[in-house]
Amino acid sequence: MKNSIPILPKSVALELTYKCNHHCLFCSCPWYAPNSSYPLGKELSTTQWKWVIEKLYDYGVKTFSLSGGEALLRDDLHEIIGHIRMIGNQRKMNYPIILISNGRLMNEGHLKYFKEMNVHLSMSLPGYLSFEEHTGVDNADYVLECFSKAKEIGLECTANITVTRKNYYELFETISLA
């Protein structure tokens, strides 16, 4: 580590995009909060994200979590993940990369790439019965199918469940389905 700064965390969460294809009731993105005055600036380019990643590695960061919005809406997501992995391998730091996704754009190609790159996948599943009410999209069965495919290929996966008054009653059933 060139310039490790002891006050920096060893893990960072990078919100790669403002864009999202869900409308979740529990969204924590400040630019979508009710009455928000948080400005939407221009998103970083691939080159800019690569520079940020290299600097974070220089300062001692080891683990990267990627989200958005919905990170899969970025055309360069695989390139960004590949860059994180390449720099980590060069520095003999093969820590997992965590991708937080709503799963809507997930496919077998993504799943295979994430397995190859040692990406830990965290997909949103706010409730099987209440999924559409929480997200604005009827996508629960597809997300569950993605969990099954991930398990089949040995991709580490987590169900990201935001517990609310609308879904607490189905929490354990949702967990068992994932």
Question: Where are the regions that the model predicts?
Answer:
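Radical SAM/AdoMet-radical enzyme domain recognition
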Residues: T46-S67, R74-A178
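Short active-site-proximal "capping" loops at secondary-structure junctions
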Residues: Y32-A33, E70-L72
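Short acidic donor-binding/metal-coordinating loop in glycosyltransferase active sites
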Residues: L16, G68-G69
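Canonical Radical SAM [4Fe-4S] cluster-binding loop centered on the CxxxCxxC motif
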Residues: S4-T46
